[in-house]
Amino acid sequence: MNLTAPKSAIVIGGGPAGLVAAGRLAEGGLSTTLLEASARLGGRAATEHREGFDLNQGPHALYVGGAAMRELRAMGIDLPRWNPTSVRSVFVRGGKPRRLPGGSLELAGWLTAVARNRQEGLGGLSVSEWLRQSLRSERARATAGALVRVTTFVADHDALSADVAAGQLRIGLLPGVRYLRGGWQSLVDALAARAERAGATLCPRAGARAVEQSAEGWTVTLDEQILRAEVLVIAAGGPKDAAALLGDRSPTAPGPAAELSVLDLGLDSLPRAARHFALGIDSPTYLSRHSAPDHRNGVLLSLASYAHAPREQLEAMADTVQPGWRERVRLQRFLPRMVAISAIPSPTNGGLAARPAVDRGQGLYVAGDWLGPDGWLVDAAISSGAAAAAAALRSPVFATA
């Protein structure tokens, strides 16, 4: 056996992680094929365009200070986006909208400290423990918990490690987030176009049925075809999807998945024009305008519950924040129990830094929002996809002489 540079790669999964990996591998000179089981690329980043509205698979935001934005800049991708930050916010407590969330003075000082100082040693603490140790006021803790929910998409703060929350709050506060014009499909389309320009072959409707290691590297079996490559990147879904293909070789999930329920409302206009954003303080709910201010075909509101509440609870929040919305609605879509995060890093497992490694050895890599030490949500997906490609390009593989 001799060491040689890899010449070919197969990427399974056409979401952001897989598209980034495929593009980077093709740029590095590898003959790269991406396989996506569904008819369209994007995974949970795909967007549905209906009645003039761009409907993402749940509320999505791009963190300006996050790993995804850094990688997009490095790839020369500049997506049309807008800043949703608004002073037109309300906080819902006791079923009533309020201008101030409660515990504001103590909370402001704490948030300033979180934004300015990188918090160390939080991987072994739960969010609940961290907030109890950091804030004296119960109201301040409740508001901090609401901010953690909206930045992490996780309602179970006993299960989530505090390092995730601290990192998300820090980049969420400054430099903040942006929403993408055209929905997150614009991100998917840009990554796909770049991968194809680099030479990658993107194959929708091509589901991998089995993978096996072979003397030449890896063999992937499809319904009517067998492909072989020296490098294999699994970027399809979450831990269960990886395990279905890899069996015992699959990384162990660092924790359970996090789910949310989403209600999208396309309105002719807002009954309360000054209310663009609302956060539930004593319930794990959220409301935000997800159409740009200059959108001329109505207003899109996205409501979410991080505890997969029934539709009626989200409608009740809309009644509280935007009374009269039912007379102006022309589109409704309810998505129950969607996967928001494939696996939650727990404090008992060491938190974010202890997530499974992307490089699994022998030309095998796994990418997604639950792998690698860097980032959360799409930041983790894109970061792990880039890390998989970088590791493959610098790692020689064994091949027969």
Regions found by a protein language model. Name each.
Residues 96-97, 106-179:
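Rossmann-like flavin
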Residues 2, 290-401:
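Conserved flavin/dinucleotide-binding core of flavoenzymes
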Residues 4, 209-310, 355-356:
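Mid-domain catalytic core of redox enzymes
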Residues 7-34:
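N-terminal Rossmann-like FAD-binding beta1-loop-alpha1 element of flavoenzymes
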Residues 167-218, 222:
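Helical element adjacent to the flavin cofactor pocket in flavoenzyme catalytic cores
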Residues 46-54, 62-112:
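A conserved beta-strand/loop capping segment in the N-terminal third of enzymes
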